From Swiss-Prot:
SUPFAM superfamilies linked to this entry: MurCD N-terminal domain, MurD-like peptide ligases, catalytic domain, MurD-like peptide ligases, peptide-binding domain
Enzyme class: ligase
Origin organism lineage: Bacteria, Pseudomonadati, Pseudomonadota, Gammaproteobacteria, Oceanospirillales
Domain of life: Bacteria
Entry's Gene Ontology cellular component terms: cytoplasm
Name of protein: UDP-N-acetylmuramate--L-alanine ligase
């Protein structure tokens, strides 16, 4: 998959006769990770696509490059002429564009409904799970492409090799993330479903009931046709617990000895892992090298191997696809190095999107395994007050595992502040635990001076979180930010 394939030419419409009345599709919240990819694929299928978002971003600029009209701000005129509106769950239903559509009998659908329509006439592969969806979707898409199957993909992060998070392929396969955050993945009816893990997150959707969350994942699996296939991670206790209730054909994967696709002889050296992928009888084991750190990424790769093997991808193509996999934006993305303040040597700059305690813990474990002799400095921005409240003690425990912690206030993502779930309170609880003395960052303007004070030669600096801190390590690597506090 190469950067030259980013802007796919307009192709034959494959959404079938059902959408023959639809010419103009308008996205409300088009800059969102789950929205922009669907918009790009539809534009490449020949639809007129427009959209609106609250603010300008690299995503909105990219969409304009794809001949999609993007408006900044929300007013009803933006939706005029549309035959259907696609909305994300982050958008208020009192949005003026949505109100206009309802007043004029224009259908308003959720993003998952439109994704389901794209999937309807293809061999759909849906990747679900609390953690690892984006990486697993990217790996699966890469292996199918390496095998010559030319898949369409819709991913929640930028696939580095393609330079985009979506692409319209010529083949029959469509690979996409299945979002459990609002239970909208139940709209999807794929041929293959992956479940990487099930963890407590987005619990408001499930009325705080973890059993209900697990039941919803089971319902998602039962959306498979009777001839479909589920690919399930046996290392996750919650996924394993579902197996007796799954009424579709499935294969399992994991480090577990009873997994159908078993990962053994795992070794990590720096940012690369090597392992043997044992497969079901009749398929030879594969020796794998992957340029991503961590046991969790090896598991993500094993899920992709299971799907690619089922699709008949050649063994050599699987090995080459993983060997040359260039990663995903903001998933342990190494931006480069920065000269260490006041000394020889430099600081390794890493950016990661993880914002759940388990995700942060996996990043920390990957650093400890790959660079055990180096100090880990984490700049963490909590994401959502509700998540911070619900997983508070887990955050305290996990964030206590770094060497130096700089803690920003919570990125609200539109939520109101919740007493006791603020960044300053979290910093106090971590300090009280006694393993690390966190520095609470009042304002991002303080960061250059603070980083200059705490960083040492050979440190690893990780900017961690799903909010708006992702550009800091990139700006440092590009020489656009001076740790003496001056913009270059």
């Amino acid at each position: 998959m190469t950067a030259s394939s980013v802007h796919s030419p307009v192709r034959q419409n494959r959404t079938g006769l059902g959408m023959r009345r639809i010419r103009h599709i308008h996205f409300v919240g088009i800059g969102g990770a789950g929205m922009c990819g669907i918009a790009e694929v539809l534009a490449n299928q020949g639809y007129i696509v427009s959209g609106s978002d609250l603010r300008e971003s690299a995503v909105t600029r990219h969409l304009r490059d794809c001949d999609i009209r993007v408006y900044i701000g929300h007013v009803d005129e933006h939706a005029h002429g549309a035959d259907v509106l696609v909305v994300s769950t982050a958008v208020d239903l009192e949005n003026p564009e949505i109100r206009w559509a309802r007043e004029h009998r224009i259908p308003v659908v959720r993003r998952a409904e439109m994704l389901a329509e794209l999937m309807r006439f293809r061999h759909g592969i849906a990747v679900a799970g609390t953690h690892g969806k984006t990486t697993t979707t990217s790996l699966t898409s890469t292996l199918l492409a390496e095998g010559g199957l030319d898949p369409t993909f819709v991913i929640g992060g930028k696939l580095t090799s393609a330079g985009t998070n979506a692409r319209l392929g010529e083949g029959d396969y469509l690979v996409a993330e299945a979002d459990e955050s609002d239970a909208s993945f139940l709209h999807l009816q794929p041929m293959v479903s992956i479940v990487t893990n099930i963890d407590a997150d987005h619990m408001a959707t499930y009325a705080g009931d973890f059993a209900r969350l697990k039941d919803t994942f089971l319902e998602f699996l039962h959306n498979l046709p009777f001839y479909g296939l589920a690919v399930l991670c046996l290392d996750d206790d919650n996924v394993r617990g579902l197996l007796p209730r799954v009424q579709r054909q499935f294969v399992t994967y994991g480090f577990a000895e009873d997994a159908d696709y078993r990962l053994r002889d795992f070794v990590q050296r720096g940012g690369e892992v090597q392992f043997t992928a044992e497969r079901p009888p009749g398929m030879a084991p594969l020796e794998i090298r992957l340029g991503m750190p961590g046991r969790h990424n090896a598991l993500n790769a094993l899920a992709a191997i299971a799907v690619a093997s089922d699709a008949g991808v050649d063994d050599a193509a699987i090995q080459q696809g993983l060997l040359h996999f260039a990663g995903v934006g903001r998933r342990f993305q190494v931006h480069g190095h920065y000269p260490a303040p006041g000394g020889e040597g430099d600081v390794m700059l890493v950016d990661d999107y993880g914002h759940h305690p388990r995700e942060v813990e996996m990043v920390i474990d990957a650093v400890r395994a790959g660079w055990p002799e180096r100090r880990l400095v984490m700049l963490y921005q909590p994401h959502r007050y509700s998540r911070t409240r619900d997983l508070y003690e887990d955050f305290v425990r996990v964030l206590s595992g770094v060497d130096t912690l700089l803690l920003l206030d919570v990125y609200s993502a539109g939520e109101s502040s919740i007493p006791g779930a603020e960044g300053r309170t979290l910093a106090g609880s971590i300090r009280q635990r006694g393993q690390v003395d966190p520095i609470f960052v009042e304002s991002k303007q303080e960061l250059p001076a603070l980083l200059s004070r705490v960083l040492r030669p050979d440190d690893i600096l990780i900017t961690q979180g799903a909010g708006d801190i992702g550009g800091i390590s990139l700006r440092l690597a590009a020489g656009q930010l001076d740790l003496n506090g001056m913009e270059l």
